[in-house]
């Protein structure tokens, strides 16, 4: 997700865990493959050896920033690419990005946001109960899922 129309400056890498709808937003310096790869390596370090259990699949669009995702085979995570101009193929992510735009409107530079600002906005989104989730929050369900994974 980019801030300004020209795509320059900082951008946001966003991920959705499909079962719990947990939203993860990571600020990247630029919308480049290298910046996204660095963010994903940080996420891998955070998850440790259980990364394949936390992220069973990842679906990305065909943007040039995702060309290195094929190298995620070391994660034992399947990577799927959607067809160009098919945002409907990732509805949860698109809806959550729309919610994120309340905190960082289109055209607003992401450069001014700190990592803490980005994480705080994602936490607010994950803290909203969802009817689809039995009025639980994505955060509650994701935490329970992580507890299950890391205690097994």
Feature-to-residue mapping (PLM):
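An active-site-proximal beta-strand-loop segment
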Residues: 1-20
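C-terminal domain-tail junction helix/linker
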Residues: 106-152
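Active-site beta-loop-alpha junctions of metal-dependent nucleic acid enzymes
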Residues: 4-8, 25-50
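Active-site proximal loops enriched in glycine and acidic residues that flank catalytic Cys/His/Asp
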Residues: 17, 27-28, 59-62, 83-84, ...
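Short active-site oxyanion
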Residues: 55-57
């Amino acid at each position: 997700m980019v801030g300004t129309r020209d795509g320059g400056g900082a951008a946001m890498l966003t991920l959705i865990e499909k079962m719990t709808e947990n939203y993860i937003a990571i600020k990247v310096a630029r919308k480049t493959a290298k910046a996204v790869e660095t963010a994903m390596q940080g996420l891998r370090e955070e998850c440790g050896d259980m990364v394949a259990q936390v992220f069973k699949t990842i679906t990305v669009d065909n943007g040039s920033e995702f060309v290195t995702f094929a190298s995620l085979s070391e994660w034992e995570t399947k990577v799927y690419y959607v067809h160009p101009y098919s945002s409907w193929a990732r509805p949860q992510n698109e809806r959550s990005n729309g919610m994120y735009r309340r905190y960082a409107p289109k055209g607003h530079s992401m450069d001014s946001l700190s990592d803490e600002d980005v994480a705080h906005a994602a936490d607010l989104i994950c803290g909203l109960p969802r009817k689809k989730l039995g009025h639980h929050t994505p955060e509650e369900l994701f935490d329970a899922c992580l507890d299950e994974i890391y205690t097994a």
